[in-house]
């Protein structure tokens, strides 16, 4: 009677180890040159189209930067501007900017950057600041520069 033979396992020890996992390669660096002057002037020249595009780009960029960390997604601004904002008689815009500002502040804190934009910044500068006319401009300046800082940090550290 013959004994069944054990299968032979070929272990090749001389095989080189797998290379370490590389982080996903970013296709291009994120924009870091948002400015209030360009936002206002191009907004006037294009009758607001540039402003809509810029806020859409801010939301998409924030999704790219922060979704890994917090698991949230900001609603696309085109959907907010053309549909939800009008259907909710403006309340949708208030909620969208509140959440956007809060998320920017949270991401700044998580990355160790100075927190310059929060939900309070939105309510105090953009809403109450409307009474002194320059408040919304100050809020927009802070928002655009906070996004520039986040994008620069993302370009440097991922």
Which residues are covered by each model-predicted region?
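Membrane-interface extramembranous regions at the lipid-water interface
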Residues: 2-84, 92-129, 136-158
């Amino acid at each position: 009677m013959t004994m069944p033979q054990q299968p032979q396992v070929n272990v090749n020890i001389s095989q080189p180890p797998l290379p370490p996992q590389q982080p996903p390669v970013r296709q291009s660096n994120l924009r870091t040159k948002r400015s209030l002057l360009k936002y206002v002037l191009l907004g006037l020249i294009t009758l607001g189209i540039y402003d809509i595009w810029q806020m859409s780009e801010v939301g998409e960029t924030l999704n790219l930067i922060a979704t890994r960390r917090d698991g949230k997604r900001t609603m696309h601004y085109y959907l907010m501007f053309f549909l939800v904002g009008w259907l909710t008689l403006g309340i949708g815009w208030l909620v969208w900017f509140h959440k956007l500002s809060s998320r920017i502040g949270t991401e700044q804190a998580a990355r160790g950057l100075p927190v310059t934009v929060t939900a309070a910044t939105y309510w105090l500068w953009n809403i109450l600041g409307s009474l002194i006319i320059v408040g919304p401009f100050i809020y927009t300046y802070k928002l655009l520069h906070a996004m520039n800082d986040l994008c620069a940090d993302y370009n440097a550290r991922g």
